[in-house]
Curated annotation (Swiss-Prot):
Residues 144-171 are annotated as: Flexible linker. It holds the Pfam family RuvA_C. Residues 148-177 are annotated as: Disordered. It comes from Jannaschia sp. (strain CCS1). Residues 1-64 are annotated as: Domain I. It comes from the Bacteria. This is Holliday junction branch migration complex subunit RuvA. Has three domains with a flexible linker between the domains II and III and assumes an 'L' shape. Domain III is highly mobile and contacts RuvB.
Amino acid sequence: MIGKLTGRLDYKGSDHALIDVGGVGYVVHCSDRTLAALPARGEVVALYTDLLVREDLLQLFGFLSPYEKEWHRLLTSVQGVGAKASMAILGTLGVEGAARAITLGDATAIKAAPGVGPKLAQRVVMELKDKAPAVMAMGGTLDDAMDDVVDDMPGESAAPAPAPQPRAPKRPASNAQAEALSALQNLGYGPSDAAQAVAQAAESASNTPELIRAALRLLAPKE
């Protein structure tokens, strides 16, 4: 299993990138957002990968963070959602947008992804709504693994230091949401209720304290 690639970017296609790792070129399929965040040609890039294995096909899919990769794996666990549909959802909504839409049961947002019809969007929401909180809670821990992801390339110690690896879009948001979700669960709120409150609060709050306060207001008993 290939879980991560670190190499030099040879080129970017419409839906994939070619990464040179020690003289071997790997074709890695990525979402539009991931492709847009990659560095310039010739610079060092690191992607977390998921390998799709079929009888007549081997395909690598790349992600800027382990958190994004986990969401891809969760999405593809839904019947009818292949890697292409998952990439479309993540490319259209981003990780945070997809998490928010699923947690709040917003099938319309999921349907905005190219190739995702209303029935499939509804199935995604229904099947993943209860599973989303667990992945959301992993966000902060997984994103910590992004630190220092670009190591020195073998045999290139004398080369100029590579440009810093681009971070995943909205990484601080996923970290804050994971921390807020964990805090609410520690206060006794159920995973599903806590995740819905955090997802709603994220529309107007960004850092952890703000998210917790806003979520608690949403969870407070209505008079």
